[in-house]
UniProtKB/Swiss-Prot annotation:
This is Glucose-1-phosphate adenylyltransferase. It comes from Paramagnetospirillum magneticum (strain ATCC 700264 / AMB-1). The keyword Nucleotide-binding applies. NCBIfam families: glgC, PRK00725.1, PRK00844.1. Belongs to the bacterial/plant glucose-1-phosphate adenylyltransferase family. Keywords: ATP-binding, Carbohydrate metabolism, Glycogen biosynthesis, Glycogen metabolism, Nucleotide-binding, Nucleotidyltransferase, Transferase.
Length: 429
């Protein structure tokens, strides 16, 4: 396994120089259909997370904190809110120092007038722009995962190993590995096999219940990437995808190195795990948000050495009003964002995003309430997610009757109910 400290200061100087010559490309065009109605009008990377952020903020912050200041964000599906967020919150880079975040929506730039047909095709359709920046290395990233990672350490490994391509990887339970690219490596972490979403994932040697999975993070030597994408673009038998086509085709002919996430994961003192989450299902999204309300969550949002940057709306402080025995505004074991008012209501183990109004006599427990929600009096909301801008009618009860919840809303197998404006309209609310 790579030791990022073994070459000392020399590698730091070299890597810092190479980071300045690296171009990061964030793939942020996916819908994330498993999030159901949450992505009806927003791409998955634009979905709110952790009270005040968007999912894409974590990948962008990793770039900035790692010293990568040349970034392209590739968008496609319903990108308006994502583009707006980046324009408002990420305009602090200095163009005079060749720092930038370029927004690269699908524009049918190539012959055939096709939209992005796959992850590799998305990059190929922007090759002219990428060429113009003359990068030495291209870092390809997914914009829809939540994690903290120092990409400089991954680049150091790439350079030290003399790699053509480096693939970030993480150990996952074998039963969930079907949803990932699964790889096998030799004693030097050279990838000797790569299968994208296999029906029968190969377990790790000595760990029959674990598989080594791709994180969808790649470092390419730039010229090699250009050549590969040109060849892929004229291949009629390819799906134009990095995981399905590009990486498997390189394993035998090129030096493809696996970089273990634990070697570059940014962890806080006392952390119990290397935190990486695909919040691509309703259950996973709810669990990741609710975990942040615990005393010692797996993800530390308060680490000033690795800040998560975002758009900062001009909201007043959160407000809690009324203090009588039966009408007390309070929140316990919860995160409450700016602009919220908890008026004579009780909030427990919940996440309130910005500008949420919880009116008198309400009970909100184990709930994720997205921005600009108004919860009417006497409502009881438990184990649920309430979508952005929803007006919850007075007296609505969610989370107490599984059968009724399943009839009215989308309810997961784990018992999480998704409350949306569209479903409430069907109820006549």
């Amino acid at each position: 396994m790579f030791d990022p400290t073994e070459r000392g200061t020399a590698i730091d100087i070299e890597v810092n120089d190479r980071l300045r010559k690296t171009l990061a490309l964030i793939l942020a065009g996916g819908r994330g259909s498993r999030l159901m109605d949450l992505t009806d009008w927003h791409a998955k990377p634009a979905i709110p997370f952790a009270g005040k952020f968007r999912i894409v903020d974590f990948t962008l912050s990793n770039c900035i904190n790692s010293g990568i200041r040349r970034i392209g964000v590739l968008t496609q599906y319903k990108a308006h809110s994502l583009l707006q967020h980046i324009q408002r919150g990420w305009g602090f880079l200095r163009g005079e120092f060749n720092e930038f975040i370029e927004l690269l929506p699908a524009q049918q730039r190539t012959q055939g007038e096709n939209w992005y047909k796959g992850t590799a095709d998305a990059v190929f359709q922007n090759l002219d722009i990428i060429h113009a920046h003359r990068p030495e290395h291209v870092l390809v990233l997914a914009g829809d995962h939540v994690y903290k990672m120092h990409y400089g350490k991954m680049l150091a490994h790439h350079l030290a190993a003399g790699a053509d391509v480096t693939v970030a990887c993480i150990e996952v339970p074998l039963e969930t590995a079907k949803g990932f690219g699964v790889m096998a490596v030799d004693e030097d972490d050279r990838v000797i096999r790569f299968d994208e979403k296999p029906d029968h994932p190969q377990p790790m040697p000595g760990h029959p219940d674990q598989a080594l999975a791709s994180m969808g993070i790649y470092i390419f030597n730039a010229q090699l990437l250009f050549d590969l994408l040109q060849k892929d673009s004229i291949n009629p038998e390819t799906s134009h995808d990095f995981g399905k086509d590009i990486i498997p085709s390189l394993v035998k002919s090129h030096r493809v190195i696996a970089h273990h996430f634990q070697d570059s994961c940014v962890m806080h003192e006392g952390a119990r795990e290397h935190y990486w989450r695909d919040v691509g299902t309703i259950d996973a999204y709810w669990e990741a948000n609710i975990d942040l309300t615990t005393v010692t969550p797996a993800l530390n949002l308060y680490d000033e050495s690795w800040p998560i940057w975002t758009d900062q709306p001009q909201s007043p402080p959160a407000k809690f009003v009324f203090d009588s025995e039966h009408r007390r505004g309070m929140a316990v074991d919860s995160l409450v964002a700016g602009g919220c008012i908890v008026s004579g209501a009780v909030v427990r183990r919940s996440m309130l995003f910005s500008n949420v109004r919880v009116n008198s006599f309400c009970v909100v427990e184990d709930a994720v309430i997205l921005p600009n929600v108004d919860i009417g009096r006497h409502a009881r909301l438990k184990r649920c997610i309430v979508d952005q801008g929803v007006v919850v009618p007075p007296g609505l009860v969610v989370g107490e009757d599984p059968v009724l919840d399943a009839k009215r809303f989308h309810r997961t197998e784990k018992g999480i109910t998704l409350v949306t404006a569209e479903k409430l309209k069907l109820l006549g609310a």
